[in-house]
UniProtKB/Swiss-Prot annotation:
This is Claudin-2. Coiled coil: none annotated. Forms paracellular channels: polymerizes in tight junction strands with cation- and water-selective channels through the strands, conveying epithelial permeability in a process known as paracellular tight junction permeability. In intestinal epithelium, allows for sodium and water fluxes from the peritoneal side to the lumen of the intestine to regulate nutrient absorption and clear enteric pathogens as part of mucosal immune response. In kidney, allows passive sodium and calcium reabsorption across proximal tubules from the lumen back to the bloodstream. One of its GO terms (biological process) is innate immune response in mucosa. It comes from Canis lupus familiaris (Dog). Keywords: Cell junction, Cell membrane, Disulfide bond, Isopeptide bond, Membrane, Phosphoprotein, Tight junction, Transmembrane, Transmembrane helix, Ubl conjugation. The gene is CLDN2. The keyword DNA repair does not apply. Residues 1-7, 103-116, 184-230 are cytoplasmic.
Length: 230
């Protein structure tokens, strides 16, 4: 029961990590305008994501435009696009494999195969979490570096957007989910020792009493000889 509960907790965390990664990948708020120095008073605020950038006017109107070309984007944005898409794909595969390997499902009745599939799903969650964490940390480092650099104009400085916070939390969820699934399955030797020893016994000895167990007493009826009544 403990391993079943751990598998459920791990799967829920992995599913939340996948959904959070998808939302963070699509949000256009990886970088937001920084209101420091000469850019404190401005009528337009900008935010940039992996696929589009948005401009929010003082009137409350927001306009978003998808990038016209992907090849002209900075290297960190292109790498983040590839890694986030790969992370989402691997995490989706991890969800499918983990469902088959969980003990509460009816797929693949062989318990040993289910345990292996659960571990494989956990490994996929770990890989997906790492692929989602790397681009988020990379962009986070770039934002902080430019923000504190005196060589970058104030109008070109950005702050950390909500999507980066969501990406960090989602990747951590995926990593924790993978670790839980990998360690939720018991050791094969401890679980199947009795089963293997029972299968190894010959048929003639399965009905014999175990060592240290007293033999069953014969019934009173069997103790009488039938020849005494003839």
């Amino acid at each position: 029961m403990a391993s079943l509960g751990l598998q459920l907790v791990g799967y829920i965390l992995g599913l939340l990590g996948l959904l959070g990664t998808l939302v963070a990948m699509l949000l256009p708020s990886w970088r937001t305008s920084s209101y420091v120095g000469t850019s404190i008073v401005t009528a337009v605020g900008f935010s940039k994501g992996l696929w589009m950038e948005c401009a929010t006017h003082s009137t409350g109107i927001t306009q978003c435009d998808i990038y016209s070309t992907l090849l002209g984007l900075p290297a960190d944005i292109q790498a983040a696009q590839a890694m986030m898409v790969t992370s989402s794909a691997i995490s989706s595969l991890a969800c499918i494999v983990s469902v088959v390997g969980m003990r509460c499902t009816v797929f693949c009745q062989d318990s040993r195969a289910k345990d292996r599939l659960a571990v494989v799903g956990g490994v996929f969650f770990i890989i997906g979490g790492l692929l989602g964490f790397i681009p988020v940390a990379w962009n986070l480092h770039g934002i902080l570096r430019d923000f504190y650099s005196p060589l970058v104009p104030d109008s070109m400085k950005f702050e950390i957007g909500e999507a980066l916070y969501l990406g960090i939390i989602s990747s951590l969820f995926s990593l924790v989910a993978g670790i839980i699934l990998c360690f939720s399955c018991p050791l094969q030797g401890n679980r199947s020792d009795y089963y293997d020893s029972y299968q190894a016994q010959p048929l003639a000895t399965r009905g014999s009493p175990r060592p240290g167990q007293p033999p069953k007493a014969k019934s009173e009826f069997n103790s009488y000889s039938l020849t005494g009544y003839v």
